[in-house]
């Protein structure tokens, strides 16, 4: 199977290319924090030679509680994204939840993301595809890896083949997620070689059965990310925060920003090693 390459400016995203770090924060909390977080990622990735795309949401439209922080909204969020691009020269990925958001967001950012809970909403998928932007499809927690091929087909039928697939864990009973490492290769096959990336921090979520906010397993972020890269994938999707305990969303799963350089150093070493190996033919 030939690996497809999705180009984001001068960045090549492919399962056999050096891994791309899609990193940032869960949701835009303020302009100043976005600048701080983006600058930290840029410094680390430039120092270590890792291709980088900034990620954050302008609206967390699927929060469990109506009282939970959602973000600054599309208009203010796009202003912040544009300032980040102008200041740091970064590529940006963000998610959309409504059809009317697709084109305005695609006019500013470089990748638009299809949220996991909305991945089978055909009208939204078609509207995103018709922008011509690169699309990152989050695998729903309730969907098998092989079923991602149907979502890819919807996008391609609209004339867009710039598709990235992202695993963010699978439901394991109630209120828990696991990551099936065999699923990455299944998604590659189902999409005929599309780049597959791994959302490591969201995969660490744990639900409180009777609460509105998720808890998380931040202490295991390194071992889970190592495992994903060992399979041979196109990139990691990561959230970091200056003070995770005060984050407005998913702090228990976020990497402390102070640990970012050590984390990326380890991930690059693993990715370089894995992709230096020849592919073994195990067929009979």
UniProtKB/Swiss-Prot annotation:
<keyword id="KW-0448">Lipopolysaccharide biosynthesis</keyword>
<dbReference type="InterPro" id="IPR013785">
    <property type="entry name" value="Aldolase_TIM"/>
</dbReference>
<dbReference type="GO" id="GO:0019294">
    <property type="term" value="P:keto-3-deoxy-D-manno-octulosonic acid biosynthetic process"/>
</dbReference>
<dbReference type="InterPro" id="IPR006218">
    <property type="entry name" value="DAHP1/KDSA"/>
</dbReference>
<dbReference type="Pfam" id="PF00793">
    <property type="entry name" value="DAHP_synth_1"/>
</dbReference>
<comment type="pathway">
    <text>Bacterial outer membrane biogenesis; lipopolysaccharide biosynthesis.</text>
</comment>
<keyword id="KW-0963">Cytoplasm</keyword>
<keyword id="KW-0808">Transferase</keyword>
<protein>
    <recommendedName>
        <fullName>2-dehydro-3-deoxyphosphooctonate aldolase</fullName>
        <ecNumber>2.5.1.55</ecNumber>
    </recommendedName>
</protein>
<comment type="pathway">
    <text>Carbohydrate biosynthesis; 3-deoxy-D-manno-octulosonate biosynthesis; 3-deoxy-D-manno-octulosonate from D-ribulose 5-phosphate: step 2/3.</text>
</comment>
<dbReference type="GO" id="GO:0008676">
    <property type="term" value="F:3-deoxy-8-phosphooctulonate synthase activity"/>
</dbReference>
<dbReference type="GO" id="GO:0005737">
    <property type="term" value="C:cytoplasm"/>
</dbReference>
<dbReference type="InterPro" id="IPR006269">
    <property type="entry name" value="KDO8P_synthase"/>
</dbReference>
<comment type="similarity">
    <text>Belongs to the KdsA family.</text>
</comment>
């Amino acid at each position: 199977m030939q690996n497809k390459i999705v180009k984001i400016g001068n960045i090549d995203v492919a399962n056999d290319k050096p891994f791309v770090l899609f990193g940032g924060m869960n949701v835009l909390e303020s302009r100043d924090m976005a600048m701080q977080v983006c600058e930290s990622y840029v410094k680390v990735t430039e120092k270590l030679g890792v291709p980088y795309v900034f990620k954050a949401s302008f609206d967390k439209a699927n929060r469990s509680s109506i009282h939970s922080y959602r973000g600054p909204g599309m208009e203010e969020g796009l202003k912040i994204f544009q300032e980040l691009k102008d200041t740091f020269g970064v590529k940006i990925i963000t998610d959309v939840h409504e059809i009317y958001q697709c084109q305005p967001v695609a006019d500013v950012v470089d990748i638009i993301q299809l949220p996991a809970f909305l991945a089978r909403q055909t009208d939204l998928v078609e509207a995103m595809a018709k922008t011509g932007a690169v699309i990152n499809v989050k695998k729903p927690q309730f969907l098998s890896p092989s079923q991602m091929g149907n979502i890819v087909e919807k996008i391609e039928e609209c004339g867009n083949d710039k598709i990235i697939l992202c695993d963010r864990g699978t439901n394991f009973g109630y209120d828990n997620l696991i990551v099936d490492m065999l699923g990455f290769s299944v998604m590659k096959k189902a999409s005929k070689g599309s780049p597959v990336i791994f959302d490591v921090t969201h995969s660490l979520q744990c639900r409180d059965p009777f609460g509105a906010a998720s808890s998380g397993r931040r202490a295991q972020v390194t071992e889970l990310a190592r495992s994903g890269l060992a399979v041979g994938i196109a990139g990691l999707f990561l959230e970091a925060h200056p003070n995770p305990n005060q984050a407005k969303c998913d702090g228990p799963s976020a990497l402390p920003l102070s640990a970012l350089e050590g984390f990326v150093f380890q991930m690059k070493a693993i990715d370089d090693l894995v992709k230096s190996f020849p592919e073994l033919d195990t067929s009979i």
